[in-house]
């Protein structure tokens, strides 16, 4: 049974430098008397609260994108600006694309019916050549 309280993560986008952000295009904006607002999105995504300061600084519009930067900040860009700078990365982001190389390589060793070892630093896959053990 699906969890009725589950809200999926926002889709990922990547810029030309390989920096990832999560973003959604705004479907509707509901303003409050204090200058804050709630952005609504298509699909199963929860509304996003925008403070009065965020609304005053970015002046978000329907169709533009709310996004979380790589630092976790909530930011806004117009549709034209966002789509000129970012491309969809959802479904294509592998851990290897975003992982750092290990500062110290690790040795993976097999013992028992077969033996072998390989050094792994996270920069590429490894293959272990095996020989019959004891």
UniProtKB/Swiss-Prot annotation:
Function statement: May cover virion head capsid and play a role in capsid stabilization.
Taxonomy, superkingdom: Viruses
Gene: dec
Name of the protein: Decoration protein
GO cellular component, one term: viral capsid, decoration
Keyword tags: Capsid decoration protein, Capsid protein, Late protein, Virion
Subcellular location: Virion
């Amino acid at each position: 049974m699906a969890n009725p309280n589950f809200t999926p993560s926002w889709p990922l986008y990547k810029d030309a430098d390989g920096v990832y952000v999560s973003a959604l295009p705004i479907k509707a904006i509901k303003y409050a008397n204090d200058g804050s607002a709630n952005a609504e999105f298509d699909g199963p995504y929860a509304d996003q609260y925008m403070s009065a300061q965020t609304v005053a600084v970015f002046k978000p519009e329907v169709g533009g994108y709310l996004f979380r930067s790589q630092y976790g900040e909530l930011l806004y860009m117009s549709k034209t600006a966002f789509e000129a700078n970012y491309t969809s990365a959802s479904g294509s982001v592998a851990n290897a694309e975003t992982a750092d190389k290990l500062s110290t390589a690790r040795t993976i060793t097999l013992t028992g019916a077969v033996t072998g070892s390989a050094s792994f630093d996270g920069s590429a896959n490894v293959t272990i050549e095996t020989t019959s053990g004891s």
